[in-house]
């Protein structure tokens, strides 16, 4: 019965995401629509950004502005990546889900600071559909701000931990080595959850 409920919720969210993505190109060029989540069968960590860059929206894939964002560089230091593996397969194969705090917003250019009139994604419902997720990771200060503005801590059960990390964006004036060291917690969480689910 519980699985049926999750399945129905997942189908509803998928319909909304498909409808949402098909409306990606808008007459209002400042209106930016986010992507559907990347998620596999048993995610342990949900990483939330703010809103994808224009390059990512155009390609319908997360963190594609790779000259200005170190996300995949960080992930490749933490997890082994197979030759020729797509970004999405690489992420979900390591029990990570990707999404954003913002579903849609007005934004001129790529800067998160320019986001206005934003509408949040239904992250609470997403976590209900994917009960294996134990930790939400907020990618940067603005993602943290957007998340807590829309979702008070009381909205989540005690089993969900929420942590904020230095932004993977190169706009964050922090050395890569410092970012990598802070982001290692993602690997620790994945490894710990893998052991729990094996027992």
Language-model regions, residue ranges each:
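C-terminal capping/extension of enzyme domains
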Residues: 2-44, 53, 65-67, 111-124, ...
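Short beta-strand segments
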Residues: 42-48, 58-61
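Short, solvent-exposed loop/turn segments at secondary-structure junctions
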Residues: 51-55, 69, 103-106, 141-145, ...
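Short, surface-exposed acidic-centric catalytic microdomains
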Residues: 55-115
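Hydrophobic packing residues within well-ordered alpha-helices of enzyme cores
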Residues: 75, 146-147
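Internal catalytic-core helix/loop-beta-alpha segment
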Residues: 93-146
